[in-house]
Curated annotation (Swiss-Prot):
GO cellular component: plasma membrane
Segments traversing the membrane: 41-61, 71-91, 95-115, 130-150, 184-204
Subcellular location: Cell inner membrane
Species: Pseudomonas aeruginosa (strain LESB58)
Protein name, UniProt field: Ion-translocating oxidoreductase complex subunit E
Length: 238
């Protein structure tokens, strides 16, 4: 796989075709667990691992699975990998596993994972499929993390609270409280706040894309005549 392929897959996963901001897949866990940084990071990492491993596994068996049973086979692969992640979390981060609850098993039914298995992994080699899964998972995890951080900051006035649930006792002092007297904003950590914050993130991304597209047109010289500035003989722009 060429360097250009790597860059294209990275751009798609992290920005142009981001699962959370563009495809709008996996909204149930995205909105349900993003009320704090630690919850968002925990589920994001779990989803990223399952997505990368499932893409690799699907790519390996794609030639041995018939068209008739392809989707059930893919779901079984995803379910096995999700169970492995679930067991690891029970062993190493049990308190966080209890907090996330049903959202860990629900990784099996996450449309992001099944969608990439069907649309990409089943049609590409192991290396491309693994990298696509890793970058799509990373893009999803980053949206989760940003959303969780913003909601925690607005809702509780803290950042990185309870990180010991994921990283152990050494992370107990990671908590940041920028505004000690802040009383919190309850709406931010409730489901309606999740919808509002996600909508704002999507709007911000769309605005950035529009600005980049306009800049590219200007640099390419493809600007409508009505928008061009007239330049006098003196060289001064009107």
């Amino acid at each position: 796989m060429s360097e250009q392929d790597f860059r294209e897959i990275a751009r798609n996963g992290l920005w142009r075709n981001n699962p959370g901001l563009v495809q709008l897949l996996g909204l149930c866990p995205l909105l349900g667990t993003s009320n704090s940084t630690v919850n968002a990071l925990g589920l994001g990492l779990a989803t990223m691992l399952v997505l990368a491993c499932s893409n690799a596994a699907v790519s390996l068996v794609r030639g041995a699975v018939s068209e008739a049973i392809r989707l059930p086979a893919f779901v079984m692969i995803i379910a096995v990998l999700t169970t492995c992640i679930e067991l690891l979390m029970q062993a190493w981060t049990y308190e966080l596993y209890q907090v996330l609850g049903i959202f860990i098993p629900l990784i099996t039914t996450n449309c992001v994972i099944l969608g990439r298995a069907e649309a990409f992994a089943a049609k590409n080699g192991v290396l491309r499929a693994s990298f696509d899964g890793l970058l799509m998972g990373l893009g999803f995890a980053l949206v989760l993390l940003v959303l969780g951080g913003l909601r925690e900051l607005l809702g509780q006035g803290t950042l990185l609270a309870d990180m010991h649930l994921l990283f152990g006792p050494a992370a107990a002092d990671w908590k940041i409280q920028p505004f000690p007297q802040y009383q919190g904003f309850l709406l931010a950590i409730l489901p309606p706040g999740a919808f509002i914050m996600l909508g704002l993130l999507i709007a911000l991304k769309n605005r950035i894309d529009e600005s980049l597209a306009e800049r590219a047109k200007v640099q390419a010289g493809d600007v409508p005549a009505t928008q061009r500035q007239r330049v006098r003989v003196t060289g001064v722009i009107e």
